[in-house]
Amino acid sequence: MNLRDEFERIMREQREIALATMSEGLPHVRIVNFYYDTEKHCVYFATFKDNEKVVELAANPSIAFTTVPHNNTTEHVRASGHAVKSARPITAITEAIVAKAPRFQETVDAVGDDLIPYEITLTEAVVLIGRDHWSRIVF
């Protein structure tokens, strides 16, 4: 089993990440839709510009996340890094996120101007396929 291939598959198939930010020494976790760019090793997500997440990330861009398993599996990816506002417009990531989470299009259509795209550049991640199948991969 090639765990790098499994990483790519999980990032392609799973629709959401549980994203953890920090504020005043406390973690805050939210579920967000995401898109993973295999060439740039970047995770993209969007949030509303008036969301507390924006304030938290401006004060401390350090994050951690885990993909949210689906289809009765426990396989997932977990990673940490820094989330920064993306130079890409929301329109640049919409199609890729909608391919995984079709209802995201409704949000973009209704309030796209209020969404800020963020990116997380990965340097390493842990891939967990099962209790005995896991590995740390470095990009």
PLM ranges: what are they?
Residues 21-23, 68-70, 106-113:
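A short, aromatic/hydrophobic, helix- or strand-capping loop or linear motif
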Residues 11-12, 58-59, 98:
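Alpha-helix boundary recognition
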Residues 14-49, 57, 63-67, 76-79:
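Short beta-strand segments
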Residues 1-17:
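Extreme N-terminal tail/first-helix region
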